[in-house]
Amino acid sequence: MTTTSTTSVDGRTSSTLKATLSASGPNSNGPTPAVLPQKPKLTGWAQAAAKALPRQQQQQQQARKDDSVAVQPANTKTKTIASTAPPANIKGSSTANGSSTNKKFKRANKQPYNREEVRSYMHKLFQSYTAGEKSHSMKTYKQVLSETASGRVSTATDWGTVSSSKNKNKKYGCLSDIAKVLRNQ
């Protein structure tokens, strides 16, 4: 049975809808009040965490929840509060010997970056190019400029063009192209 009433609070009128359910017998066709607590649908991380729990632990938690619901009064206005005690066996918790079950494994120890070693290698490499025997393929910057000005530049040493179709219009030399030229000379 549904009734509508109008109430006045502080001079304001508001209509409220009250639904009252009579106790239904076995022969009544009306709705029966359901007192069974419904589980909220788990989504996102809560659903993944629930799936990750072992079956036995889920049953233990369900039994704990049932016990806590049975102790509380059957008043419909009070909310059911589940126990907030942490479960005994969750990933990342400590085991009996004190070690964590979800340890992050350390990466293999790398040697630290040795700036002095790299600096000395680059210096030796530079010295070998400048002080060593100059091959006929090595050119100084002045030689390249003079060849460019005279128009005698081959395509291999034309730094204004790029062989890649992606960077065709751009007027800079790709490092890979420069490396190819240096290797071929």
Swiss-Prot record:
The record's region (Disordered) falls at 1-116, 147-168
Q: Name one GO cellular component term.
A: peroxisome
Q: What UniProt keywords are attached to this protein's entry?
A: Cytoplasm, Nucleus
The record's subcellular locations are: Cytoplasm; Nucleus
> How is the quaternary structure described?
Interacts with IGO1, LSM12 and PBP1.
The note filed under miscellaneous reads: Present with 1560 molecules/cell in log phase SD medium.
Please report the name of this protein according to its UniProt entry.
Answer: Protein PBP4
The species this protein was found in:
Saccharomyces cerevisiae (strain ATCC 204508 / S288c) (Baker's yeast)
